[in-house]
Curated annotation (Swiss-Prot):
It is found in: Cytoplasm. This is Oxygen-independent coproporphyrinogen III oxidase. Its cofactor is [4Fe-4S] cluster. Monomer. GO terms for molecular function: 4 iron, 4 sulfur cluster binding; coproporphyrinogen dehydrogenase activity; coproporphyrinogen oxidase activity; metal ion binding. It is an enzyme of class 1 (oxidoreductase). One of its GO terms (cellular component) is cytoplasm. InterPro entries: Coprogen_oxidase_HemN, Coproporphyrinogen-III_oxidase, Elp3/MiaA/NifB-like_rSAM, HemN_C, rSAM. Residues 1-151 form the Radical SAM core domain. Keywords: 4Fe-4S, Chlorophyll biosynthesis, Cytoplasm, Iron, Iron-sulfur, Metal-binding, Oxidoreductase, Porphyrin biosynthesis, S-adenosyl-L-methionine.
Amino acid sequence: AFLMTKDAEISIEVSPRYINGDYFLRGRKLGFNRISFGVQDFDPQVQLAVNRVQRETMFFQVMEWIRAAEFESVNIDLIYGLPYQTVQSFEATIAKTLRLDPDRIAVFNFAYLPNLKPIQKRIDPTTLPDSATKLTILQRVIERLTSQGYRYIGMDHFAKPTDELAIAQRSGDLKRNFQGYTTLPTADLIGFGLTSISMLQAAYAQNQKHLATYFSDVAAGHHGPQECGFNCTVEDLLRRTIIMELMCQFSLDKGAIARQFNLDFDAYFASELAALRELAADGLLHLGRDRLEVTPVGRLLIRNITAVFDAYLQQKSGRTFSKAI
């Protein structure tokens, strides 16, 4: 068992289709104080295409149960880029999400990876919105949610001004890990269960992906049923620091990086700065003598900007990964 501090942030993600009001009351008594659930999209045609049919009334009932159980914060996940989505249909989804009045909203880009996720082969790729449509959807989402008082947090999150994420962004303390944005300063993440990922200060590890292997490792008394792991080099930590700073603050103090890692920033990253000048010419960022500043337009393409500092990108060029937009 773990001993929890009184101010611990204990979150749980639930599937609205398989729970009732008692579930939330029990969860709250167990100490959970934050909760998240996925809507993805309210449009029936979109839901049917991704085999996730969910009644609209169900979400409002779930939100009533959550509020009655007095959870401190509620997050809703949406996904754009799904089959049959249009700018207009997703605007309707945003309007209904606002009626639910969550504290946080995460709006993720759909990763269409049929080679890695065979179940996605059931999706007709001709029904997917193109990149231009997805970019317009994201722009409209930002406009609508910020006009309703939500703060745009990083690449894909929105939060009410009183939420801890928004407060952390204003104070410059916002952090990001592979799960998303967080207020926790460089905390270690320990993954439990099948496929889970652990993240330590300078290392990553992923548990077994196959159930039989996972159980056999646990039964054998292995301290960690890991399938793979990775130790970060100083170079990895340097580039991770830069990428995370840009993704969280949309600016970079070159001098601070130079002092932290004892290097001449402009000389060390000469080729990266040359690539960034092309993006600057497109209006995505400003290159100052001491700082890099991402523009509002550049925020929409922050993955493209930070990719310049990804030393492994060329090694991965032969593999398929999700697109930035």
